[in-house]
From Swiss-Prot:
Residues 100-156 are extracellular. The modification Phosphoserine is found at residues 31, 126. Residues 1-65 are annotated as: Disordered. This is Radiation-inducible immediate-early gene IEX-1. The modification Phosphothreonine is found at residues 18, 123. It is a single-pass type II membrane protein. One of its GO terms (biological process) is DNA damage response.
Length: 156
């Protein structure tokens, strides 16, 4: 296969590179000592101090990403809600009324109409009725249990 423009084989002549005569007496660019020594390289003292980045060429940037150390995101300020405040106020009032309620005292009834002579008279106090325990068994049940335990002491 031919890789050139014409399909004819081409020949190139390689010439040996000839060193160009150097006019600068200092060290050549990119060359170090021909023999390795532990001596430090001489620094060029006559380097122009213009722009150091321009003389070095393109420098590779660091790949380290600089994030801030710790950033706490603050939540937005919650707007006051009047309906929520009113709800908490009403719940507080109901809770206080439940705590301060006295047991066994009936709640006073508000007058239905305007005050008249009958309402000014003292009303008789109704007797406080004790609540009945409808789930309690008659006392003969307790006697039956005691007689059962006397007859069968090893049952329990």
């Amino acid at each position: 296969m031919c890789h050139s423009r014409s399909c004819h084989p081409t020949m190139t002549i390689l010439q040996a590179p000839t060193p160009a005569p150097s006019t600068n007496p200092g060290p050549r660019r990119g060359s170090g000592p021909e023999i390795f020594t532990f001596d430090p390289l001489p620094e060029p003292a006559a380097a122009p101090a213009g722009r150091p980045s321009a003389s070095r060429g393109h420098r590779k940037r660091s790949r380290r990403v600089l994030y801030p150390r710790v950033v706490r995101r603050q939540l937005p300020v919650e707007e006051p809600n009047p309906a929520k405040r009113l709800l908490f106020l009403l719940l507080t009032i109901v809770f206080c009324q439940i705590l301060m309620a006295e047991e066994g005292v009936p709640a006073p009834l508000p007058p239905e109409d305007a005050p008249n002579a009958a309402s000014l008279a003292p009303t008789p106090v109704s007797p406080v009725l004790e609540p009945f325990n409808l789930t309690s068994e008659p006392s003969d049940y307790a006697l039956d249990l005691s007689t059962f335990l006397q007859q069968h002491p090893a049952a329990f």
